[in-house]
Amino acid sequence: MDLIIIAVFALFLRIFLLGSERIFLKQLEEYDSVIISAVFFLTGSFFLLPIFLVIPQETLLTGLEDLQFALISSFIYTFGFFAYVKALSEEDASLIAPLYNASLLWLLVLSVLFLGEDVGIFRVFGAFIMFIGVFFLYPGKITEKFHKIRESKASLLMIGGSFFLALGRTIDTFAIRTIDSRVYAFSILFFAGLFFLGIAIFTKKCNDGFLALKNDLKTILCAGFTNGWAYIMLLIAIAGLEVTVAEPASLLSVFVTAFLAKLFLKEEIEERLFGMVLMVLGAILLVIKIPI
């Protein structure tokens, strides 16, 4: 019973951390997205360093031998997370948060093609509900919704970028069969941060990073902390709960983002709530494996 209580508490913490992460990133919108992504991931990996104190040495060494998966996946993630950070800098957090879950639609396609998973009627229905939910994130009549989606570069960027998030997630599925998930999580964050840092150096965007560290260090640290420890909370949660409970419940972070965006960023979220509900419901149907 104690393990279940701890797991449930960790799950609630994960939902809060995921929801607040987007708010911290939104507050860094004035800086270049590439260098902010670099700082975001490197800071996140820094906050994950304590996990190495509890990882057995033999497990750590085995994980280090298979880091090519993390290198490939983190390189792919750079495209998806750049879209994520860039979209947050240009649009409301309460809009981008549910669109982030569009990666589950891409993941369904990739899982069927490369992992041999069955589609199932519930997953098809979930995909349809998510698709409909996208339109309800925008106000107006159906023709106006189409126009606003087409005109919103940030929305299209996030939907397109979510493909790379799904592709990276597919590689992760193969990788964690042989690599300790904690070592892998740190490696993904660290390598992604290095990739972004390399791009920032090449494009001469580092000055913006120094400016961000000088003026918004607290926000950067909070963003990195929420990024790294949201995953640790997931590991604790699935130690006492089924993954099919922990993963769908994590989608509720969309509503945490919406609440915090309303409270701190003064975003108008009321017209988006129904769309959020539809997208979360559809995403849950995609994630939960129902034997039909």
Placement of each model-derived feature along the sequence:
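Hydrophobic/small/kink-forming positions within alpha-helical transmembrane segments
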Residues: 19, 49, 74, 78-79, ...
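Membrane-interface interhelical linkers
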Residues: 1-72, 81-91, 139-157, 179, ...
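Hydrophobic/aromatic residues within transmembrane alpha-helices
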Residues: 28, 36, 87, 99, ...
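Alpha-helical transmembrane segments
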Residues: 66-74, 117-131, 180-192
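Alpha-helical transmembrane segments of compact multi-pass small-molecule transporters, enriched
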Residues: 43-47, 99-113, 191-195, 230, ...
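Structural signature of transmembrane alpha-helices in multi-pass secondary transporters
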Residues: 14, 44, 73, 97-104, ...
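Hydrophobic/aromatic positions within or immediately flanking transmembrane alpha-helices
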Residues: 11, 29, 34-38, 70, ...
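Juxtamembrane helix-loop boundary signature in multi-pass membrane transporters
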Residues: 1-12, 105-163, 173, 268-292
